[in-house]
Swiss-Prot record:
Its EC number is 3.1.2.22, 3.1.1.93. It is found in: Mitochondrion. Its main location: mitochondrion. The keyword Transit peptide applies. Belongs to the AB hydrolase superfamily. It comes from the Eukaryota. Acts as an acyl-protein thioesterase that hydrolyzes fatty acids from acylated residues in proteins. Regulates the mitochondrial S-depalmitoylation of the nucleophilic active site residue of peroxiredoxin-5/PRDX5, a key antioxidant protein, therefore modulating mitochondrial antioxidant ability. Also catalyzes the deglucuronidation of mycophenolic acid acyl-glucuronide, an active metabolite of the immunosuppressant drug mycophenolate. It catalyses: S-hexadecanoyl-L-cysteinyl-[protein] + H2O = L-cysteinyl-[protein] + hexadecanoate + H(+); mycophenolic acid O-acyl-beta-D-glucuronide + H2O = mycophenolate + D-glucuronate + H(+). Keywords: Hydrolase, Mitochondrion, Transit peptide. GO terms for cellular component: mitochondrion. Residues 78-177 form the AB hydrolase-1 domain. The keyword Transit peptide applies. This is Palmitoyl-protein thioesterase ABHD10, mitochondrial. The gene is ABHD10.
Amino acid sequence: MAGVGLAAVPAWVPCRRWGLAAVTFGFHHGLSTLLARKTERAPQWLRACRHKTSISFLSRPDLPNLAYKRLKGKSPGIIFIPGYISNMNGTKALAIEEFCKSLGHAYIRFDYSGVGNSDGNLEECTVGKWRKDVLSIIDDLAEGPQILVGSSLGGWLMFHAAIARPQKVVALVGVATAVDGLVTQFNQLPIETKKEIEMKGVWPMPSKYSEEGVYRIQYSVIKEAEHHCLLHSPIPVKCPVRLLHGMKDDIVPWHTSVQVADRVVSTDVDVILRKNSDHRMKEKADIQLLVYTIDDLIDKLSTIVH
């Protein structure tokens, strides 16, 4: 995989803005040691994620209104794209907001159609419709160059956004990136099970993150998702890409991020693995790694611009 860096243990350099350490990538010192910083030195965004920004709504003709929260600030802006049926108030979304506040960077987080405070019927939502949601946020709300941070399904959608808006999307950060995830999981089912789902029209997909223990996904949603698969050919994204993944992820195997890295055309791609992290990657060390990765990209982009 020429140009692809696989780093289970990032190295560190002093950060110019708030005195801790920012991530660089390569096989160097142990990550657990490097992340074991004293809490008293941690920036405010790591100590507490305060939910202060007011909710706004993006009105769209013939499409559901989208709930969002926005911080005005400098470029590049950051947009957080949540996971499947996740809203904009998750741990990662709030931590990134506090990080952006501390540096004065623009930031947007939002709810998909049919999720959270946004309008729309979840049962009618598809990968294609959520892709349109992301593009609406980029086109109608974001100003200037943007770093997209996608979690799980959001990681799949961020690649579609980068392909559709290459002039505006300048870097990608994926967390447990689930490119083609819905289709891949369905295709791994036994033939008899797939036939039964097709006949009934609903897939009760098991999930420990659902209160019912399953997500009820329409068969039509799975078939529609097939039109948005990316792993069957080179992914035409040329910007810097960072893919963070937990090796204990039992929803989207970490090998998926390696496969994505291999498919991406960009030569500036790093896969960063956390040995003991799960799919959600929401522990303190995971969040530190995420924001340090974003900070490193901001540094990199500033160097390129200037």
